């Protein structure tokens, strides 16, 4: 089960699905416009179940699944400016889970925030269950999951809907600050 963060990743996922012959495979086809990235001349398939690190940081791991990656990058920039260094990772796969990536992120950070366009019981819950089964939560590692709430969201502009759902950069920043007990009024948060 794959979820693309942008049009290049979507192309790679389509190629992966076309070449995969060992069972069922699926990917989420995102709604809306592409980001306008320059497409490579040659599209390569993905290694099944492997995510990627987009940016390395030290304190916070932002683990994204799907198209919220640009909001994750904006949140990372804001948090970095506050002295809260962030790693950004693109999970790419909800299943199979990249357990090596998750282990590395949990070992090298104080907090992990998962961001997905799924509902409760989805990718974030899968990550949380893995961390619990491995005993990683026993030593105080912190994790928060951001996902679509189980409420009716009024149809409209996609950015407004994501803001209402709490899947925007501002809410990612607020979630991090709340975990660390930082009063957001101490910082000027620039809205994106």
Enumerate the predicted regions with their spans.
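Conserved glycine-bearing catalytic or ligand-binding loops at nucleotide- and phosphate-handling centers
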Residues: 3-20
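Thiamine diphosphate
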Residues: 19-192
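Active-site core segments that coordinate phosphate-bearing ligands/cofactors
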Residues: 1-5, 39-40
């Amino acid at each position: 089960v794959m979820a693309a963060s942008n049009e290049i990743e979507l192309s790679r996922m389509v190629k992966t699905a076309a070449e995969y012959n060992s069972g069922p495979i699926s990917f989420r086809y995102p709604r809306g416009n592409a980001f306008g990235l320059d497409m490579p001349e040659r599209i390569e398939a993905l290694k099944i179940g492997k995510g990627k690190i987009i940016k390395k940081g030290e304190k916070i791991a932002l683990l994204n699944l799907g198209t919220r990656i640009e909001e994750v990058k904006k949140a990372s920039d804001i948090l970095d400016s506050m002295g809260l260094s962030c790693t950004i990772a693109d999970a790419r796969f909800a299943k199979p889970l990249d357990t090596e990536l998750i282990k590395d992120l949990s070992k090298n950070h104080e907090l992990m925030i998962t961001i997905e366009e799924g509902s409760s019981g989805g990718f974030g819950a899968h990550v949380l269950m893995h961390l619990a089964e491995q005993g990683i939560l026993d030593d105080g590692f912190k994790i928060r999951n951001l996902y679509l709430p189980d409420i009716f969201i009024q149809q409209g502009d996609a950015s407004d809907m994501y803001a209402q759902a709490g899947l925007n950069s501002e809410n990612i920043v607020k979630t991090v600050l709340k975990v660390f007990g930082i009063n957001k009024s101490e910082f000027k948060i620039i809205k994106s």
